[in-house]
From Swiss-Prot:
Keyword Transferase: yes
Recorded superkingdom: Bacteria
Top-level EC class: transferase
EC number: 2.7.7.108
Functional summary from the UniProt entry: Probable adenylyltransferase that mediates the addition of adenosine 5'-monophosphate (AMP) to specific residues of target proteins. Involved in cell filamentation induced by cyclic AMP.
Catalytic reaction equation(s): L-tyrosyl-[protein] + ATP = O-(5'-adenylyl)-L-tyrosyl-[protein] + diphosphate; L-threonyl-[protein] + ATP = 3-O-(5'-adenylyl)-L-threonyl-[protein] + diphosphate
Single biological process term from Gene Ontology: regulation of cell division
Alphabetic keyword roster: ATP-binding, Nucleotide-binding, Nucleotidyltransferase, Transferase
Residues that coordinate or bind ATP: 84-85, 140-142, 146, 172
ATP-binding among keywords: yes
Domain Fido: 54-191
Name by which UniProt lists this protein: Probable protein adenylyltransferase Fic
Name of one Pfam family that matches: Fic
Amino acid sequence: MSDKFGEGRDPYLYPGLNVMRNRLGIHQAQRLAQAAYEMTALRAATIELGPLVRGLPHLCAIHRQLYQDIFDWAGQLREVDIYQGDTRFCHFAYIEKEGNALMQDLEEEGYLVGLAHEKFVERLAHYYCEINVLHPFRFGSGLAQRIFFEQLALHAGYALSWQGIAVETWKQANQSGAMGDLSALRAIFQKAISEARETE
């Protein structure tokens, strides 16, 4: 579905095609991408806020809810190495260990509840970047992660909106974050995060 994945035989792909094996029997990348977009949009609307206390299993549950109609492995941690541009994501064998350690850190910070806006933005950018580099799933990590952090923000009294964020700006911010520079991510979240209204 893109050129972001590593070389070599990939068990997630149909033989000879750069198309992921799927439950829909689609063998064309563009058609699969469109179907995934439409079906995950419907599934996303059914995802409940979930508990304040959240860990790697909760992120997996979000992914499973989103992609259960499309991939047999929905909600399962990836078993191959992948990369995007100059960013090489976490080696698959370390995902569970590193993911649990990150979630433990998040728990020790009280899931960022009670932080003033500036501090919340700073810590959210940190955790967002770390989990993005983890990239736990073969496909769909980004969407699952965005929902995970939308929920986290709501529990902390904030609303996180992705509207108005340019795709290239977002990609560059994440790549810079992976290299240790969180300034662009913080700038984006500074604008994207606001106090939640009662109805949210």
